């Protein structure tokens, strides 16, 4: 009797192991491989991370923010993860948290000094991190706030830089989701193209 029970348990264990291995193969190999191949065939740029290249050099992904510290470039919004794509996330600090207030105040003072503006003129997206910490966009207002600095650093006329900003304003997704926005990397690369053609 005991041997029959033992045999039945062993059979069930073997069946469970076979089912697990089959599902692992189907979900981990067949499904993943199929989706990867389809993605590469139908959406080759997106499947490879939407990386923007200039002169065969990868400049970054259009969907991942990166820090810009040169005054000749538009700056991205703050990142709670120091722009690390492997550690996406917000700061999780509550609005009542003193650490959040201190960080926002420090960022505000830095922007006021850098852009020669008042605190009330600073758009909120230049003070607040995004949910993922890697939002590659800023608002049109945040871009326009930086125009004077960028124009001066590049020795360009402000109207020329404003026109460039206007060209890179993206509408809300499908016209209804989100707000108008400017991709910082694309805008900065366009600035570099202007400088390249001016030489």
Swiss-Prot record:
Highest taxon in the source lineage: Bacteria
A Pfam family reported for this protein in Swiss-Prot or TrEMBL: KdpC
Gene Ontology cellular component list: plasma membrane
InterPro entries: KdpC (IPR003820)
GO molecular function, one term: P-type potassium transmembrane transporter activity
The entry's keywords: ATP-binding, Cell inner membrane, Cell membrane, Ion transport, Membrane, Nucleotide-binding, Potassium, Potassium transport, Transmembrane, Transmembrane helix, Transport
Major localization listed first in the record, in broad terms: membrane
Membrane association type: Single-pass membrane protein
Keyword Transport recorded: yes
Subcellular location per the Swiss-Prot or TrEMBL entry: Cell inner membrane
Transmembrane segments: 21-43
Alphabetized HAMAP family for the sequence: KdpC
Subunit structure and binding partners: The system is composed of three essential subunits: KdpA, KdpB and KdpC.
Job of this protein: Part of the high-affinity ATP-driven potassium transport (or Kdp) system, which catalyzes the hydrolysis of ATP coupled with the electrogenic transport of potassium into the cytoplasm. This subunit acts as a catalytic chaperone that increases the ATP-binding affinity of the ATP-hydrolyzing subunit KdpB by the formation of a transient KdpB/KdpC/ATP ternary complex.
Family membership: Belongs to the KdpC family.
Protein name per its UniProtKB record: Potassium-transporting ATPase KdpC subunit
Annotated organism of origin: Shewanella putrefaciens (strain CN-32 / ATCC BAA-453)
